[in-house]
Amino acid sequence: MSATRRVLVLQLCLMALSGCYCQGTLIESLESLKNYFNSSSMDAMEGKSLLLDIWRNWQKDGNTKILESQIISFYLRLFEVLKDNQAISNNISVIESHLITNFFSNSKAKKDAFMSIAKFEVNNPQIQHKAVNELIRVIHQLSPESSLRKRKRSRC
């Protein structure tokens, strides 16, 4: 197994273990995955972390939702690649279920919508046309003024 895969699995383990409420089956699945990729070895820990250093830097600013969504997307894509491996498929299912429960509020529809965005083909002219057409609304929704108005309305 490549060192990159080992590091990825280790990062997933650390993310999942950072919550004190982890279930026994989740911990067992993480340990099994870690053993499968031999992520406990020192070569998996060499150099910078894959995701955690970036995450820590974003946490200093207090705005991690965007980065969290990228990290979750990364792991879901990783699981998609690894799901056919019979030796670890059950462990991946347990971990993926945990991520869906915590990040997507246990909504498979939200997860599917989230993943569909990652699969858009940016070279497709029709996708480009629609994306540019929707861009002004997206920017408006993301602007600080828009969120400020939403907060003011919710207080009333």
Swiss-Prot record:
InterPro entries: 4_helix_cytokine-like_core (IPR009079), Interferon_gamma (IPR002069). The keyword Signal applies. GO terms for biological process: adaptive immune response; antigen processing and presentation; apoptotic process; astrocyte activation; CD8-positive, alpha-beta T cell differentiation involved in immune response; cell surface receptor signaling pathway via JAK-STAT; cell surface receptor signaling pathway via STAT; cellular response to interleukin-18. Residues 1-22 form the signal peptide. Released primarily from activated T lymphocytes. Coiled coil: none annotated. Glycans are attached at N38, N91. It comes from the Eukaryota. The modification Pyrrolidone carboxylic acid is found at Q23. Disulfide bonds: none annotated. GO terms for molecular function: cytokine activity; type II interferon receptor binding. The keyword Cell inner membrane does not apply. Keywords: Antiviral defense, Cytokine, Glycoprotein, Growth regulation, Pyrrolidone carboxylic acid, Secreted, Signal. GO terms for cellular component: external side of plasma membrane; extracellular region; extracellular space; perikaryon. It is found in: Secreted. Its main location: secreted. Belongs to the type II (or gamma) interferon family. PANTHER family: INTERFERON GAMMA (PTHR11419:SF0). Type II interferon produced by immune cells such as T-cells and NK cells that plays crucial roles in antimicrobial, antiviral, and antitumor responses by activating effector immune cells and enhancing antigen presentation. Primarily signals through the JAK-STAT pathway after interaction with its receptor IFNGR1 to affect gene regulation. Upon IFNG binding, IFNGR1 intracellular domain opens out to allow association of downstream signaling components JAK2, JAK1 and STAT1, leading to STAT1 activation, nuclear translocation and transcription of IFNG-regulated genes. Homodimer. Interacts with IFNGR1 (via extracellular domain); this interaction promotes IFNGR1 dimerization. This is Interferon gamma. The gene is Ifng.
